[in-house]
């Protein structure tokens, strides 16, 4: 097969993820690859929260345009940045094994969320993290924090924040695990849908390529991600609402935990459901939570 061109964002984390996929394709499928890097609107507009400027799709559009114009064959993403609905003609072709899905508490002064003094300033731009943090500690001050991992860490080191919240997976992949002060338990902060999973996006029409990429697919990641994304799709959730979902696979049984919260964290609804059909499980849990008032909570 001809060389595969992989579209990637320019950040260190994006390139780590893309090189991980590139190496697997070359080693396991014996197909040569090259990486084409590009800036996305999500990388350029850093002075506003994502939920105010168009959401997670801002990290993908330029990569998808490259695929449509035959400048790239596939794109690599963090699954948590992929909206529940892809543009027509695109599909998720392969799911990589999941890294630690938990949120990370990072601080130079305090050992855990519990150690933070009243009024401590915590940096995150995620409504999901903000809502759950405020639900657990309503005496904290949450301030927006955008930029790549290195930018966020430097803002912490410069004293702009007492602590920041990041995805553990990104820090682990960039060999910055020593910066993690506390892996936040999922009981306190339920992860984002797909957090910790790297995914390959491709064009549906490219059957030959899809067949080959499928050989790299991690069944466990695919099944838990499908359950989490089905839940999110049924709720029609994006980055403008506080939604979390995390699934675990044991034999063939999937345990799906989900959370919706008001942006101030005062109202929160958590539920858990077990099943063996990931799509059905995600939809059923979402419907149960809708019946319990999920939409009212998200709107408040």
Swiss-Prot record:
Pathway, per record: Porphyrin-containing compound metabolism; protoporphyrin-IX biosynthesis; coproporphyrinogen-III from 5-aminolevulinate: step 2/4
Note describing how the cofactor binds: Binds 1 dipyrromethane group covalently.
Top-level EC class as recorded in UniProt: transferase
Any single biological process term in GO: protoporphyrinogen IX biosynthetic process
Residues modified to S-(dipyrrolylmethanemethyl)cysteine: 239
Pfam family, one: Porphobil_deam
Catalytic reactions of this protein: 4 porphobilinogen + H2O = hydroxymethylbilane + 4 NH4(+)
Xref: InterPro entries: HemC, Porphobilin_deaminase_cofac_BS, Porphobilin_deaminase_N, Porphobilinogen_deaminase_C, Porphobilinogen_deaminase_C_sf
GO MF annotation terms: hydroxymethylbilane synthase activity
CDD domains, alphabetized: PBP2_EcHMBS_like
Cofactor(s), by name: dipyrromethane
Enzyme Commission code(s) on record: 2.5.1.61
Keyword Protein biosynthesis: no
Keywords in alphabetical order: Porphyrin biosynthesis, Transferase
One annotated Gene Ontology cellular component of this protein: cytoplasm
Note: The porphobilinogen subunits are added to the dipyrromethane group.
Family: Belongs to the HMBS family.
Function, in words: Tetrapolymerization of the monopyrrole PBG into the hydroxymethylbilane pre-uroporphyrinogen in several discrete steps.
Subunit structure: Monomer.
Protein name per Swiss-Prot or TrEMBL: Porphobilinogen deaminase
The species this protein was found in: Francisella tularensis subsp. tularensis (strain SCHU S4 / Schu 4)
